[in-house]
């Protein structure tokens, strides 16, 4: 009975999160990422971040994926419950000090702050397999075509 109650609570939380979720348009997300200081952060461009968000979640803030090891990944950047957030189920390091469900709404500043922490780790963007497979070494300018963002001309600049 206790397990059933836990499942009901989790489903209720996910339903509420889904109601406040958003699937971002590419250029809309590019603008948010640029405004949050991701262009040039640790030498990566908004194109890198758009590419990761596309392949991880399809720009969907409510996306949750479950891994064979029992951990889950949350939000637009698919932040893992074993390392970056706490879902109350998976043993976690919770390195971003955040509840995983807080990553499932349209308010992505907390996702961005946590993603910056991931990018600042020893793995940097390689922490996302999608970046290694689809983004690294590719022309990422296509991700920004038609978007009115003010990008830094020197992507090695970092104001953080």
Curated annotation (Swiss-Prot):
Disulfide cross-links: 27-147, 51-135, 85-100, 96-114
Alphabetized GO MF terms: lysozyme activity
Signal peptide interval: 1-21
Pfam families: Lys
Keywords, alphabetical: Disulfide bond, Glycosidase, Hydrolase, Secreted, Signal
Gene3D superfamilies: 1.10.530.10
EC id: 3.2.1.17
Keyword Secreted recorded: yes
Domain C-type lysozyme residue range list: 22-150
GO cellular component, one term: extracellular region
Tree of life domain: Eukaryota
Active site: 56
Reaction equations catalysed: Hydrolysis of (1->4)-beta-linkages between N-acetylmuramic acid and N-acetyl-D-glucosamine residues in a peptidoglycan and between N-acetyl-D-glucosamine residues in chitodextrins
Subcellular location: Secreted
Enzyme class: hydrolase
Family that this chain belongs to: Belongs to the glycosyl hydrolase 22 family.
Protein name: Sperm acrosome-associated protein 5
The species this protein was found in: Mus musculus (Mouse)
